[in-house]
Amino acid sequence: MWLMFLVFMDKDTLAAILIVTAILIAGGIWAVLMNYSQAPTDSGSPTRYTYHIVKTYPHDTAAFTEGLVFSNGSLYESTGEYGYSSLRRVNLENGTVQQEFLLPSQYFGEGLTAINDSLIQLTWQEKIGFVYDKQTFGLLGNFSFSTQGWGLTYNGSELIMSDGTSNLYFLNPVTYQKVGQISVHDGKAPVTNINELEYVNGTVYANIWHQQKIAIINPQTGTVKGWIDLTGIYQSNGIDDVLNGIAYDEQTNSLYVTGKDWPYLYQIAITITK
């Protein structure tokens, strides 16, 4: 039908229709291409959370906490400061150190995470990571990286590392080579001083150095999806005795926080601020 109609048209009208049709088709193709080229983005302001303490546990006041992680029901901790840095397995109920490896005095211990039968610990300015046997704490190997080492966590396929800036780095868990990087932001503002990390149900929880709050980060986009306000959880005495240390126990769906040289470790529950 349309073909018969086109046959009886004059040349000028036919040319005009063909040009318009070509423009519409091209525009449609361009729109499709633009749709596929744009990455999904987060929308809306971050959700605000408050907390309540479920239970309080003792914590070693000589533990300058830099990393905290649960694995198979056991709590592991990395402590910092030159000459005092350590890897520990800690009894949650009474805070006693059940097992410990002291780092050589030239290393400042930092972020910590677990992968299968191994523990991975960062150092601060030395730019070296150590891999340990989870059971014996025997050293299995080491690796290097180009930035400072602050926080470390594992999302099931990649290590995620912070360096005190607004960046998160993704590392291959076998080769420890960097495979990706994102910048963390709240709206358009970068979020800096990102410290200890914990992967919780598809998001990254991050301590922010010298702030009593935790950022909840979308690890695909770097967008801050939420803030947990921990104001008043503990009044520290020293300028460096700040909130640092997040551990999530998947087996019990429990969240724990502590700080550097704090006397307590807290199990907390969070709720949306009204």
Predicted regions: what is each one?
Residues P40-A62, L92-Q98:
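A short helix->beta-strand "capping" segment at the edge of beta-propeller domains
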Residues T56-T61, E100-S105, G141-T147, I182-A189, ...:
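Surface loop/turn motifs at the tips and blade-to-blade linkers of beta-strand repeat domains
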Residues N72-G73, N116-S118, G156-S157, N201-G202, ...:
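Short coil/turn segments that connect the beta-strands within blades of beta-propeller domains
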